């Protein structure tokens, strides 16, 4: 699963990530992540849409199912500050 953090949390860039990331590592579910900077969309032909501007970072986790992934949100600084975290399944294969 991947958590996509949106930029609507109170506190913005001042959020403390280390306790949350440490807990995910301790439970063996952390698979990586990063902040996301500015970018651009490319398309071979036709008009190109603007890149999604409100996603500021991602975290990959191992989870049994969507319910387990939701449980792993507890302690996520964006989630705890009232911001939006989008959960997406990363299909195997």
Spell out what each predicted region is.
Residues 1-93:
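Conserved, structured core segments of small domains
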